[in-house]
């Protein structure tokens, strides 16, 4: 069972296992093995203790949701385990509520100099943008999955509770890392904005989050610096097309570019980081 924020994780895991074994064992795997996926939870690794044990912390979740597709045979009853045939919808819900909210907190929080996700969640200028973006994503999800409305409300409440969890001390750097991957058209920010666009619903605040992700420039993140380099030399339109899957003349692309331009112009030095954010210009 694969537990990773990766589209098609079940097929990916299947492929990786088959590539790692001999043809003879591959036949056994195909005959007897089942490949499935589970919803991921937020887990942060810490240091390694002297005895070799890994220290980690995570959200206080007690349920495990598993995709019924790909499982072979009947699983025994397991407490707090839910096996569902609506796994794709549940993944989308999680991505556009939990992960979207964390991304908004990380990228916009970074522009205000926040170091931790809970700081961004409590920041007077950042928190309203997070909540508005979540509301946009919620509306889009309810339009897409009307029979999931009550569950989507619970997802949204959980998302806000998670980012405010001081005990986890989750860092902006961890959540924001590799912004390029998270700007994909199927990912937490652009995907949510596209879903809202498809249902002709507002997505202005999601666009602010996307603009902040495009501007993320943590010097410790080589992916972020690579993104900034490409924007500097090739322009933001290239990134919107190749990474976000948007054509320059798409209304959504124009909206994102407008927010990004406001963010960049608000800094006299044209640095994209903390000094660049001015909420009044959004």
Identify the function of each model-found stretch.
Residues 1-282:
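Substrate/ligand-engaging "lid" and interaction regions
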């Amino acid at each position: 069972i694969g537990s990773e924020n990766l589209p098609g994780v079940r097929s990916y895991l299947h492929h990786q296992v088959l590539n790692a074994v001999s043809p003879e064992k591959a036949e056994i795997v195909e005959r007897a093995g089942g490949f499935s996926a589970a919803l991921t939870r937020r887990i942060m690794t810490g240091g390694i203790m002297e005895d070799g044990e890994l220290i980690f912390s995570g959200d206080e979740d007690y349920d495990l949701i598993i995709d019924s597709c790909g499982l072979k045979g009947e699983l025994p009853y397991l407490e707090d385990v839910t096996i569902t045939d609506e796994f794709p919808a549940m993944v989308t819900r999680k991505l556009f509520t939990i992960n979207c909210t964390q991304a908004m907190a990380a990228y916009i929080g970074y522009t205000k100099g926040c170091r931790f996700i809970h700081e961004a969640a409590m920041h007077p200028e950042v928190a309203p943008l997070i909540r508005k973006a979540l509301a946009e994503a919620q509306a889009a999800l309810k339009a897409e999955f009307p029979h999931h409305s009550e569950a989507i409300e619970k997802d949204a409440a959980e998302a806000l509770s998670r980012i405010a969890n001081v005990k986890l001390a989750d860092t902006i750097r961890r959540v924001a890392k590799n912004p390029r991957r998270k700007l994909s058209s199927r990912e937490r920010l652009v995907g949510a904005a596209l879903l809202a666009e498809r249902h002709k619903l507002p997505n202005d605040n999601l666009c602010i989050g996307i603009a902040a992700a495009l501007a993320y420039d943590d010097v410790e993140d080589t992916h972020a610096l690579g993104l900034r380099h490409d924007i500097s030399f090739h322009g933001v339109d290239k990134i919107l097309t190749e990474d976000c899957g948007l054509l320059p003349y798409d209304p959504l692309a124009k909206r994102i570019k407008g927010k990004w331009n406001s963010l960049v112009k608000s800094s006299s030095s044209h640095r994209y980081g903390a000094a660049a954010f001015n909420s009044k210009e959004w």
